[in-house]
A protein has these predicted regions:
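Periplasm-facing N-terminal accessory domains of Gram-negative outer-membrane beta-barrel systems
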Residues: 18-128, 132
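Periplasmic N-terminal accessory/gating domains of Gram-negative outer-membrane beta-barrel systems
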Residues: 82-105, 109-238, 257, 264-270, ...
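Solvent-exposed loop/turn elements at secondary-structure boundaries
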Residues: 160, 530-561, 565-741, 855, ...
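Transmembrane beta-barrel wall of Gram-negative outer-membrane proteins
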Residues: 244, 273-346, 364-390, 562
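Signature of Gram-negative outer-membrane beta-barrel scaffolds
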Residues: 311-313, 421, 447-573, 623-624, ...
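Gram-negative outer-membrane beta-barrel transporters
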Residues: 524, 670, 678-839
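C-terminal beta-signal and adjacent terminal beta-strands/loops
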Residues: 588, 674, 687-688, 692, ...
Length: 939
């Protein structure tokens, strides 16, 4: 059944779902001194910022306030004949739960009892691993002011690149956590998924000051979350019953920067990675339109980031962001929200680096980006809440090569150096989301109290991509000498992805034990839409023009994901919790998945190239054996049937979603008020991953390791080093296609111990510290590979999860804030980790593989992953601020931040290709110490 048809049925029959947490909750019971429950107590929840809520306690004395916006609240309990009870300073945070036991005393006269709330540092219902990022953490801890830097502060998360004072804020940073790659991350904003399904990444960049809080989950996700990857939920600011606002200006430049170049770097003539100038400015403002009925919020921010890469080339980024929100409480027990975000990114010099000169960099421009969301929430009773969320986003950008489209692009296989120019790329990614969320509470049912969160989510996203190589040619050199060339045909592919999700969570409280039972079902598809492609400029005979009709590849994912979690109060006072979780997670299917079988994908064929006239340009008569006899490699088309509208590739009709299985067991203890320590043991296994072996569609034959012959051996000598390598080839010429299927026998094991210490801001100080030790290995089994090349050295070794980064076995982090007298505040963030892997390789020419269409060269690992590493990494950032408070007129804050305080020149990357003349040369170092000056005004 098609997802769209099933969607309509689901909304009619079920109409419930539970989205990513964007609120906090208060639960409790009202009793007399002897413990007898008090029904009918009028309980009012109020704050200076939001409209009040009220309810009456049940026959069992229970009460619940759910979906409470973050902030400071007051709880008032009234019943004739009893003293009025007032609890102030209830500090509600995203995803946190207050469990209150309120005792009312009999009163002869009308009296009030007022107490100050103590927020629990240990959440008695949390089964997973999550971090609530408060305003203090966002604004007071020194950072480059983007979400990816906040991720760096979270326990167990490793980032690909170090962001020193904002030098990397113009680009999405890679990250990995607990064995899950960045492609499994779930991006959410105000309770609805915003993940870009074409890139499986964030859909845009953000104004950092638009965030009220963040909630980041790295393990033990409930059934509202599809994958086991990092789940981020951004809670954005909204207006309240008093006018509030803030403005900021931050500045740093080369005059505020040190020099950390080593003699090695100076000897190479490198300038070092540096900031030229960064400015960050903007405002946020909101308040009431009608008190207790309607509120607004507006914001605008700019980050102008001008960097110098290690070779002295410029890399400049301009981020602009406008955000607006309207909140309405027009009817009793009903809330509405309309929000809009208009982000934009312009970047000149993308990809600049030691192997990418300016002419090969790209200039990026946005293509009409915006995001809009409408939410309506209604509380039908104290036991039932429903919320409908509708969202639409339109993302897009284009990349134009600085070298232009009239020059042929080149790449040196040995040195890694790019030359000439680069390809043109553009993408548009419109998408829709619908969530219908529900929350239902049932007392004294099946031996306990049950809180159900349940429902349905639907997402549809299109992915329109166009890729064009200049003159439809790509040149390849071998250490400066002409080697091979690739003739290309533009890629113009439109795919569409859909996901329909059902999920149910039951939180069941029985005394000290809380059980969380959950199930989730995801139904996912990807289809190909109509498109047209032009013939190759240089090779129209084998790469002609095509008109592609829309078609369905015929596969659908039905992924069932059960979850079971528990917490147990070991001491009975809510201060020592044993937690556990057992879960299976599916993987999110990219909207692009069907492009594997689209004839509209970028297609190419490779040949040996002899530059006969020495002009450095490829012409067809210089391609040896063109078009068929000399074919070395190809992709995206059938060379022997070039006009067919059917791709030689296939997608297995039995293709399933990859799985991550998880087991967590942990202990958390409140040591003293506002301070806790925790330890968590984590086991994970990733399996049923994707696999793309060679495939002959005519015979339905999938090529396996039995079709490969070898090994062929070579002894390579480079700069006095000798390497004995081996590789395999086919016993016959390769087929035209590849099949997308599941990899049999292959799995990845992840084991970790994570220790954290958390001190919430009180008594003038705050701290978050963590230590993680982890091991992740890859296992191919008997049938988990086709080409045996490199398998012997990779099997059972450390996993090269993202190529090299994210591969540290251990890491430690600490953020700290202390409020000094006279309005001064000092804070810092320190981190240390094992150096990333140094995956050394050699590249060799392989005529045996070239003869069967597997390519003219191959890269061979020379050491098991993890045997060689980059140096230990450590860093320290410090901030000093001074607050000036003006009674009735807000607060002015002066800021001095220092990043990489120790001015370390730690190497971030070296050339790993042992056969290259630049082997082991520095390609990236840590940016030097830089001071950032800032001024902020709050009211």
């Amino acid at each position: 059944m098609r997802i769209t048809a099933l969607l309509a049925l689901v909304f009619l029959v079920i109409g419930f779902s539970f989205g990513q947490e964007q609120y906090g909750n208060i639960r409790g019971v009202v009793v007399e001194k002897d413990g007898a429950p008090l029904p009918g107590v009028t309980i009012t929840l109020s704050s200076e910022k939001f409209s009040p809520r009220a309810m009456a306690s049940t026959a069992s004395g229970n009460f619940r306030f759910i979906n409470i916006p973050p902030g400071i609240w007051q709880l008032k309990c009234e019943l004739p004949g009893f003293k009025t009870y007032i609890q102030r300073n209830l500090d509600i945070r995203v995803g946190n739960n207050f469990d209150l036991r309120i005792v009312l005393d009999i009163a002869a006269l009308e009296e009030e009892v007022t107490v100050k709330a103590v927020s629990p540092i240990v959440d008695t219902k949390k089964v997973g691993i999550s971090t609530n990022v408060t305003q203090e953490m966002l604004q007071e801890i020194p950072s480059a002011r983007d979400p990816w830097v906040i991720l760096q502060q979270i326990p167990g998360i490793q980032m690909a690149y170090e962001n020193v004072g904002g030098n990397f804020s113009g680009q999405q940073n890679g990250f990995i956590s607990k064995g899950s790659p960045i492609s499994e991350a779930m991006w959410n904003m105000d309770g609805i998924s915003i993940t870009d399904l074409a890139a499986l990444a964030s859909p845009f960049y953000y104004d950092f000051d638009s965030f009220e809080e963040m909630d980041i989950v790295t393990g033990g996700q409930d059934a509202s979350i599809q994958t086991g990857g990092v789940s981020l939920n951004f809670i954005t600011r909204r207006g309240g019953n008093r006018f509030q606002g803030m403005a900021r200006f931050f500045f740093s430049n080369h005059d505020l920067q040190s020099d950390n170049r080593t003699p090695e770097l100076i000897g190479l003539g490198y300038s070092g990675n540096r900031i030229n100038q960064i400015t960050d400015y903007g405002f946020q403002f909101g308040g009431p339109i009608v008190k207790d009925k309607a509120w607004f919020w507006l914001g605008y921010g700019v980050q102008d980031i001008r960097n110098i890469v290690i070779t002295g080339f410029p890399d400049n980024t301009l981020l602009k962001n406008f955000n607006a929100k309207l909140n309405l409480n027009l009817f009793r027990n009903n809330r509405m929200e309309l929000s809009l975000i208009n982000p934009g990114k312009t970047k000149n010099g993308r990809f600049a680096g030691p192997t990418v000169p300016p002419e090969c960099t790209e200039n990026q421009n946005p293509l009409s980006n915006f995001y809009i969301k409408l939410e309506d929430e209604h509380v039908f009773s104290s036991n039932l809440l429903l919320s409908l969320k509708l969202a639409y986003h339109k993302n897009g950008f284009e990349l134009k090569p600085q070298g232009g489209m009239d020059v042929q692009a080149g790449y040196d296989v040995v040195t890694g150096m790019n030359s000439g120019t680069n390809q043109f790329f553009s993408t548009k990614r419109p998408g829709y989301s619908v969530n219908l969320d529900g929350n239902y509470f049932r007392e004294n049912f099946l031996g306990g109290n049950h809180e159900l969160k349940f429902g349905v989510e639907y997402r549809l996203e299109k992915n329109l991509e166009y890729t064009k190589c200049p003159q439809d040619v790509w040149k390849y050199y071998w250490n400066g000498e002409p080697f091979a060339a690739e003739v290309d045909r533009e890629g113009n592919s439109e795919t569409q992805g859909q996901r329909l999700s059902f999920y149910l969570n039951d939180s069941n409280v029985k005394g000290r034990l809380t059980l969380n039972l959950a199930v989730r079902l995801d139904i996912e598809k990807s289809v190909v839409n109509e498109s047209r492609i032009q013939a190759s400029e240089i090779a129209p005979e084998i790469l002609p023009a095509l008109t592609i009709n829309a078609f369905d590849p015929g596969f659908t994912f039905y992924t069932f994901s059960p979850r079971l979690g528990f917490t147990f109060d070991l001491t009975g006072d809510g201060k020592t919790m044993l937690r556990g979780n057992l879960a299976r997670y599916g993987s999110q299917l990219g909207s692009y998945a069907a492009s594997h079988v689209s004839p509209g994908q970028l297609s190419y064929a490779g040949y040996y190239w002899s530059d006969a006239n020495g002009d450095g340009r490829v012409s067809k008569n210089e391609l040896l054996g063109y078009p068929y006899e000399g074919l070395l490699w190809f992709s995206g088309f059938d060379p022997w049937n070039p006009t067919t509208l059917e791709s030689p590739n296939a997608i297995d009709k039995n293709l399933k979603s990859p799985f991550t299985d998880e087991f967590l067991l942990g202990l958390e203890r409140e040591v003293f008020t506002d301070f806790s320590i925790a330890a968590m043991f984590i086991l994970r296994r990733n399996h049923r991953t994707y696999f793309y072996p060679l495939y002959d569609k005519a015979t339905n034959k999938v090529f396996t390791q039995a079709d490969y012959i070898g090994p062929y051996s070579q002894t390579i000598t480079s700069d006095g080093r000798t390497y004995n390598i081996e590789y395999w080839t086919l016993d016959t010429y390769r087929p035209a296609g590849k099949i997308m299927t599941n990899r049999p026998d292959y799995y990845e094991n992840y084991t970790s111990l994570e220790i954290t210490a958390t001190k919430r801001l009180s008594r003038r100080w705050m701290m978050n510290a963590s230590f993680s030790y982890q091991i992740q290995t890859a296992h191919f089994g008997k049938n988990g590979f086709d080409d045996p090349t490199n398998i012997k050295i990779l099997d059972g070794a450390r996993l090269l999860a993202e190529g090299w980064w994210g591969s540290s076995d251990w890491m430690a982090k600490m953020s700290f804030l202390y409020q000094l007298p006279w309005g001064f505040n000092v804070s810092w963030f320190a981190n240390v980790r094992q150096g990333f892997m140094f995956p050394e390789q050699v590249v060799v020419q392989t005529p045996e593989r070239a003869d069967v269409g597997l390519g003219a060269d191959v890269y061979i690992y020379t050491a098991r992953p993890g045997e060689k590493r980059l140096p230990l990494h450590y860093g320290l950032d410090i901030s000093l601020t001074k607050d000036f408070r003006f009674k009735g007129y807000g607060m002015l804050t002066l800021v001095v931040d220092a990043f990489n305080v120790l001015n370390l020149g730690i190497v971030q990357w070296r050339d790993t290709l042992a056969t290259s003349p630049t082997y082991n040369q520095v390609q990236e170092i840590l940016n030097p110490r830089v001071v950032r000056l800032g001024i902020k005004y709050h009211f």
